[in-house]
Amino acid sequence: MKSAVRAAFLCGALALPPALAAREFTVLTYNVENLFDADGVAMFDDYKETGEEASYSPAKLLVKLRNIVHVLKTFNDGNGPEIIAFNEFEIDFSPGSPVEDYGKFLAEYKNLTVEQMLATKLDDNIRGLPVEALLLKYLEDEGLTGYEVVVGRDEPDLAALESGDRSVHRKAHKNAVFSKFPVKESKSHATPDARDILEVTLDIDGHPLTVFVNHWKSRASDPQAEQTRRLNARTLRDRADRILAGDASADIIIAGDFNSQYNQTKINPHLGKTALNDVLGSQGDEAATAKATGSSLYNLWHELPPEERFSDTYGGKWGTLMQKMITPGLYDHHGVQYVDDSFAVVVLPGFNTVGPLDLPRRWTNAGQGGGTSDHFPIAARFRTVGDGDKAKRVALSDPGTEDSPSELLEVGLHTLKPDQIPSFKAVHAKDPARHMGEFFRVRGKISSLRPLAIEVDGQNYLLHSHDDDLRQQLRSYPKEG
């Protein structure tokens, strides 16, 4: 069934019911995995520019921007989604060069391309630009125009960065919204040990649509982390409830990387009260949300069969950390309406996937840099329906239900056959960015036990596995040579 998900986006459009109103548009949720700028100042060592081969650099930032824009161009005949909720933009740790007027910024650099800015025209001012400005400029260069930009107001802790003590300040990222609709208002809500929750209200042909972008505390199955996520969820729930108290039919989309499974209560029962399902109230009964008013939240993962619910991998299993939830107002005939059954995972085989299992092709700084993200984006369609009846509801053809399994899906490693896995050759190591994340059959001889290494085609390669039993098994083989 995955092929149906892929085909929808490779064609640049979804199979949709007949249009009911003037305009349809796409809302994309995209964790771009560490989109860091070119100033060389970074919370993560992997993104500090050291000059070493595997170091981050302006040239690798350019590759990363190019790959992000490639994904965005698969929408709307190359024009990009109308609304994008981004995760993992770097907080600007060189705040001496802010961009407060994006129109003025684009005008200033209209005679240069980002490719020139990050190469032959690179200077200290360009190095200091925040990533949202560089991405906006790249979009303009490629003809994806008309975006307004809002970012979270997360402040960099420069003293903690200088001290190198990441236990003091671990926040490296902020959230962002790029919108082709006018921005009416934005707020940035601080929440414990996580990125600020970004709230953006957009003017959709005269009607307000509020988008919340989240990136909660990591480690989905960890009880201590779940305690923090409960606080993250409370920040969001309280703010959403204040909006709904003023208008029970308010159109609200809640999106982002929640570092929780959509069925967190079933997958991790040891956590007790969960942030996503119990505090925030994410649930899978679409009909209940469609006929309700107020606080009900339908999680769009339930639009897909259970075997198609995946956005990321960990430990040989699929996860659903990327989420999109909607309020009852998006099922009425006033303002903005969800296009039923339009939710999909953005899988572009061979581009944002790797290997025979089509796992996410995560970003790597190896070689020239390559990959896209360790998360697949997720998308859904919406439409404007004018000043219709708030009491009238969308007729659901196949409403989502609470059919979630109690275990995560296996990615399918056990299904691979030998002829699906190529043999490793020394030539593969010469282009690590291209081959990072692929599966290979390795035939060689153990050349070192500590550190563990293998010789293939006359070249030595270090071996590592998170599986201690496998490491010990490899060390039990006799060293040759």
What are these regions (language model features)?
Residues 188-192, 242-252, 260-425:
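Metal-dependent phosphoester-hydrolase catalytic domains
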Residues 20-172, 383-422, 455-458:
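N-terminal, active-site-proximal structural segment of metallo-dependent hydrolase catalytic domains
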Residues 7-17:
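Bacterial N-terminal signal peptides
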Residues 22-27, 36, 181-185, 194-218:
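Beta-strand-turn-beta hairpins that frame and shape the catalytic cleft
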Residues 300, 389-481:
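OB-fold nucleic-acid-binding modules
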Residues 50-61, 117-126, 162-165, 188, ...:
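Second-shell loop/turn segments in exported
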Residues 225-248:
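A long, amphipathic alpha-helix that forms part
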Residues 26-29, 82-88, 148-151, 175-179, ...:
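Structural recognition of the beta-strand scaffold that forms the well-ordered cores
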